[in-house]
Amino acid sequence: MTRTHDDEWDLASSVGATATMVAAGRAMATKDPRGLIDDPFAEPLVRAVGVDFFTKMMDGELDLDAIENATPVRIQSMVDGMAVRTKYFDDYFVDATDAGVRQVVILASGLDSRAYRLPWPAGTVVYEIDQPRVIEFKSNTLAEVGAEPTATRRTIPIDLRGDWPAALSAAGFDPAAPTAWLAEGLLIYLPPEAQDRLFDNITALSAPGSTIATEFVPGIVDFDAERVREMSGSFREHGVDIDMASLVYAGERNHVIDYLNGLGWRAEGVTRTELFHRHGIEVPAPEHDDPLGEIIFISATRTG
């Protein structure tokens, strides 16, 4: 499915299905005896979406021989990648709230359950922004399993291509208070100019002491669309509505660290490979790695 300026999705199709795939990875990482992350809500959310492929992936029941390029090593490298990514952003929020931040915004929140599972200090407000169907599904599913937010949770059912800053303000967001922003797993699905506009809007809403965390994928510049299209074709044969080659926006774009520094942030990054080493996880061989290549995880602080 080719992207359009006003395309929509649920959690079983298009960009939404990638959120479900990521949640399945978190569920598998949660079961890993190494115990790097703990997301008890990932599994029930994925089961509620009802895509058989992802349910079987969580349960270790996929017939990998029937799926092109799917091997136990590749699946494990994906799970490990989700583990270090989730751990990085979990730690980011803990550090931000330890520094006194009590206002959080999660952009394109998908099946993110941090508002329910992190130990937020009293008085913390977590704003979640995503398409209306995605927000409604997650809220209803977590209510059905008896989950309760560990912070004040406010949902903003709007696409990021809309006037989300106005919707955020209408929900009670205070631009005078420091904010911890998260844009996880988002940027590759934005055109280059939309990526810049996102950070421009965040900067305009950020008081000194605000922070932002995201990731940058240098490989999006020379994206191997053919390799990804072959992998996606195999997924679609098994009922997964994902064509990554048509979902992402490839080509030149500003490096996030440089762009944020130019807007008055102090940004720094760490590669996924470095995070693997930090947590004692084996770095996958290139043939088993993400087709996008290396990922840089970035955190930044608003300096003034």
Swiss-Prot record:
Keywords: Methyltransferase, S-adenosyl-L-methionine, Transferase. GO terms for biological process: methylation. Gene3D superfamilies: Vaccinia Virus protein VP39. Its EC number is 2.1.1.-. InterPro entries: Ppm1/Ppm2/Tcmp, SAM-dependent_MTases_sf, SAM_mthyl_Trfase_ML2640-like. GO terms for molecular function: methyltransferase activity. It holds the Pfam family LCM. It comes from the Bacteria. S-adenosyl-L-methionine binds at D130, D159, L160. Exhibits S-adenosyl-L-methionine-dependent methyltransferase activity. Belongs to the UPF0677 family. This is Putative S-adenosyl-L-methionine-dependent methyltransferase MAV_4444. It comes from Mycobacterium avium (strain 104).
